[in-house]
Each structure stands twice: as structure tokens, then as C-alpha cells.
Curated annotation (Swiss-Prot):
GO terms for molecular function: metal ion binding. Disulfide bonds: none annotated. This is SCO2-like protein RBE_0699. Keywords: Copper, Metal-binding. It comes from the Bacteria. The keyword Metal-binding applies. The keyword Metal-binding applies.
Length: 204
């Protein structure tokens, strides 16, 4: 009897330990693929594509408008408490570094929360980052289609809150570098230094 109790205690301790380790790794690497995310690490992964959304001024925006320019594309949402603003600050710094080196690049923020992130909300939010930022929204179907093209994972986080408008989103956190033809070049993680983009462009 006593040995069975000990086995149960040991088993429970192992489960708790594994759960704690998983949580720690998830918090330390929020930009790695989450459950359900398509693997973008494969060399032959097709990332990106044409799209049409609405910008922060309420105007129709076609991805063709990015042709002829390098661009940095990030998917997030304005209610994101830490990962998104951290990423947008890094993109802002990267744009500044590239500008100092005479490299023109367009930063683009695409919301994954279109029901709350209206053009007006995006416009106000992006005032905190580089003035060149283009903010894009659309309906749920449009956003999902664009996110799928970029292999972006996102989903509503589980919550016990009954308020339909008070929710968080789990999402991957990559910054995509696209060439002047709108083709994917490379993606950068949350922990990548802004200077990494410059280093990549200089070596390629």
C-alpha cells in the first residue's frame, strides 16, 4: 500500500516537472512554432503571396504597392501586451539602421484581430512606432487567408472571462523580410537583434 502511494507521488511530481519545463520553454521561445503552426523552417516552404487589405487610413491596400521596395512584415494585434510592441520596436530600430545605410525598407503590421483592430485603432497604435509603418486590417476571412500565406499561427487563448471583447490571442512571432518583388527572403525571431537584418542584406 505504502509503495503504491510513493509511486503515485513520484508520478505526479514528474508530470508537474514536465509541465513546468514546457511552460518555461514556451515563455522563453514565444516565437517558435506553436501547436497547429505550419513548419516554416523547411527550405522549400512557400511563404507570402499577393493580398488586398485595408490600411490605417481606411484605404484599399494591394500588396503590389510594396513591389520595388524591400519590406518587413509582422503579424500581431494592438491589444498584445508585450511580444508585439517589443517586435515593432525592433522593426523600428531595424528601419532606422537600414535608413542610415541608404537602404529603403517598408515596415508592415498586419493585425490578426480584425474585429477590434479597425483602421482607426491601427492608426493610433502605430503612432508609437516608426512613421513609415503601414497598418493593415480586413475581415476575418481575409486576415486568415493572408496569415495562411505567411504560415502564421494564431488562435484565441482560453479564458474564463465572459466579456467577448476582452480576450488574448496566441500567435507565432516572426518578422518576414520580403524582396522588391514581394518574394520571401528570410524570417527573424523575436530575440533577433535589429542589426541582423542589415547583416543578412549585406551578405546576400
Amino acid at each position: 500500500m505504502q509503495s503504491n502511494v510513493i509511486k503515485i507521488i513520484i508520478g505526479a511530481s514528474l508530470l508537474i516537472g514536465v509541465g513546468a519545463l514546457y511552460l518555461l520553454l514556451s515563455l522563453k521561445t514565444p516565437d517558435k512554432p506553436l501547436a497547429g503552426q505550419v513548419n516554416i523552417y523547411e527550405d522549400n516552404a512557400e511563404i507570402g503571396g499577393d493580398f488586398e487589405l485595408i490600411d490605417q487610413n481606411g484605404e484599399l491596400f494591394n500588396s503590389d504597392e510594396l513591389k520595388g521596395k524591400l519590406s518587413l512584415i509582422y503579424f500581431g494585434f494592438t491589444s498584445c501586451p508585450d511580444i508585439c510592441p517589443t517586435s515593432l520596436n525592433k522593426i523600428t530600430k531595424a528601419v532606422e539602421i537600414l535608413s542610415e545605410n541608404k537602404i529603403d525598407i517598408v515596415p508592415v503590421f498586419i493585425t490578426i484581430d480584425p474585429s477590434r483592430d479597425t483602421p482607426a485603432v491601427l492608426k493610433e497604435y502605430l503612432k508609437h512606432f516608426h512613421p513609415k509603418f503601414i497598418g493593415l486590417t480586413g475581415d476575418e476571412k481575409q486576415i486568415r487567408e493572408v496569415a495562411d500565406k505567411f504560415k502564421v499561427y494564431y488562435a484565441k487563448a482560453a479564458s474564463e472571462n465572459d466579456n467577448d471583447q476582452d480576450y488574448m490571442l496566441d500567435h507565432s512571432s516572426f518578422t518576414y523580410l520580403m524582396d522588391k518583388n514581394g518574394k520571401y527572403l528570410k524570417h527573424f525571431y523575436l530575440d533577433s537583434a535589429p542589426s541582423k537584418i542589415m547583416e543578412f542584406l549585406k551578405s546576400n
